[in-house]
Structures are given as C-alpha cells and as structure tokens.
C-alpha cells in the first residue's frame, strides 16, 4: 500500500497505540487532541505518559492543537474518542473537511440518549460526499500490549467490503493483523456490550468468587449480547469471532481492562464516583449499561446480567442481592432466545 496520511482523532491509550501501528507501516500520522499539555508532550518528548509511562513514540508521529491542520490533506480519518463526545467531534470534522476521506472508528459504546451505534452517528454527521462507508476497527486488544508490539488480531468491518479491505491493508503487519467483516451491527454491538459484562466479571472477582463464576458470566453474558445483537439485525456468527467472544475474553478477564477494574472496585465496596475519579479514564461500560438496559426494555430482549448491573450502578441495588436474584431466576434452556 502507498503511504497514507491518517488523522487520528483522539490521543488516548488506544488512539496512541494505533498511531504507532500506522507509523510502523510507513504512514504519516497526525494526532489531534484538545489537551494542550498532552499534544506538546507527544511532539516534544515523544511520550504520552498519561497512558504509557515507559513508551517512547517515533519522532515522525506528530500531534496537533488545530483540528484543521490535523485533517489537512488526510487520506483517512480515524475516530478514537469517547462515545459521549463522538457526535460533537464528528460535527467539527464535517465542518472542516473539504475532500472525500476514508472514515474509520475504533471506539466501543452506545450513545447514551439515542442508543445509537458509533457508525450511525458518523453517518448522520459526516455527509456521504465527504466520506467512504464507515469502517469499524474492533476486537480483543489491550493498548498496553499493542504499544509494545505484542501480537494482536482484530476485525475491520464495513458495509462496503472494499473499504474494510483498505483498512485491513492500512494496519496489518507482522504483529498486528486484521480480518474483514461486513456485519457492522454485530461487530459494534459486540464491542460495546462486552464492556458491561466485563464490569460484572470484575465485580465477581472483587467479591471473591472463583473461576467457575467468571466463566459463567462470560458465557451467559455472550448469550445475552448475541440476543440483543440479533434483534438489531446482526449475524449470530459474528459473536463467535474476534470482535465477539475474543473481545469478551480479553476484556472480561484482564486487569488491563478499565471496565474489569471498575467492576472489581465495585465488588470490593468502592463508590462509583470514587472509582471514576481514581481511574482517570473513561469507563465505557458504565454509560453503555444504561443504554443497553433501555434498549433491551424497548425491544423486549431478555438480558438479566445487564439488568442486574444496571440496578447496582443506577438504582443503588445491593450487588450480592443482584447475584442472588440472577441465580434464582426461572429455569431456562441454555440456547433459549427469550
């Protein structure tokens, strides 16, 4: 692939790690963020110590205070910002773009009020004449591992297979490999909803439960994620792939996962406000829990784990009582869809 100029919107942990992958592949990377000190640090010290204490970035990776400068002449734009600000940032990008670009995103969540997926937000806010079909970059990936070039395999999903193949070629190298998929609904819902289950898995750990319980919440969590996704039009096969069970395993079992760590703290009795303050990073699973619960109610989809986590986070329900209620639900067949 010829050298591409890629604007990376969001200098968080994942945006930074993906920037390094793109740079390793010989592409020109332009990061944009709105924290002046962070942008200056990337340019001057070639570090992003807010997320990576010991990592030195290549000097060719540049960061910009100006969104217009970051977008100037870009071949592709990669959104890696928190879900709750995606619409606002997309509006700003749309106002500046003056040519057609490939548009990708690597965020995982549902918009709090509308319950919309991120690709839908981008489609609504960026006119079609300025962009390709949206490509979703998602899968089992800790930024802490990708930044040190550990092997990572994820998915590039788009309604346009050629757009997905472009992103596959853009990112793939000897340690970072992408597979294409055209099931955007499946890939996005898997990536968003697994954060809820990771909060629950962390909570079980914080409460002192063992591996049996953790395996149970991951597998039954995958079942209810699949139920909601299929109701929205996804293929059930997607949930057995990298963006489904793969991402759920890595997020639901690892201390690297901020959602798992948040759940662990909840299980140990910490208050949510304190957890969010101490984390210093967005915990997508918290806001996604509310959106998914409301969506499940609207579509009449059975999601007992999501409902339990919602009650604990948003209604102050006792976490041990929530577990008791799940364990005493009516008996079900394992593959029941309701």
From Swiss-Prot:
Pathway: Membrane lipid metabolism; glycerophospholipid metabolism. It catalyses: sn-glycerol 3-phosphate + NAD(+) = dihydroxyacetone phosphate + NADH + H(+); sn-glycerol 3-phosphate + NADP(+) = dihydroxyacetone phosphate + NADPH + H(+). NADPH binds at residues 13-14, 108, 143, 258, 282, 284. Its EC number is 1.1.1.94. GO terms for cellular component: cytosol. The active site is at residue 194. Sn-glycerol 3-phosphate binds at residues 108, 139, 141, 194, 247, 257-259. GO terms for biological process: carbohydrate metabolic process; glycerol-3-phosphate biosynthetic process; glycerol-3-phosphate catabolic process; glycerophospholipid metabolic process; phospholipid biosynthetic process. Disulfide bonds: none annotated. The keyword Nucleus does not apply. Keywords: Cytoplasm, Lipid biosynthesis, Lipid metabolism, NAD, NADP, Nucleotide-binding, Oxidoreductase, Phospholipid biosynthesis, Phospholipid metabolism. One of its GO terms (molecular function) is glycerol-3-phosphate dehydrogenase [NAD(P)+] activity. It is found in: Cytoplasm. It comes from the Bacteria. The keyword Aminoacyl-tRNA synthetase does not apply. Pfam families: NAD_Gly3P_dh_C, NAD_Gly3P_dh_N. SUPFAM superfamilies: 6-phosphogluconate dehydrogenase C-terminal domain-like, NAD(P)-binding Rossmann-fold domains. Catalyzes the reduction of the glycolytic intermediate dihydroxyacetone phosphate (DHAP) to sn-glycerol 3-phosphate (G3P), the key precursor for phospholipid synthesis. Belongs to the NAD-dependent glycerol-3-phosphate dehydrogenase family. This is Glycerol-3-phosphate dehydrogenase [NAD(P)+]. The lineage of its organism: Bacteria, Bacillati, Bacillota, Bacilli, Lactobacillales. The gene is gpsA.
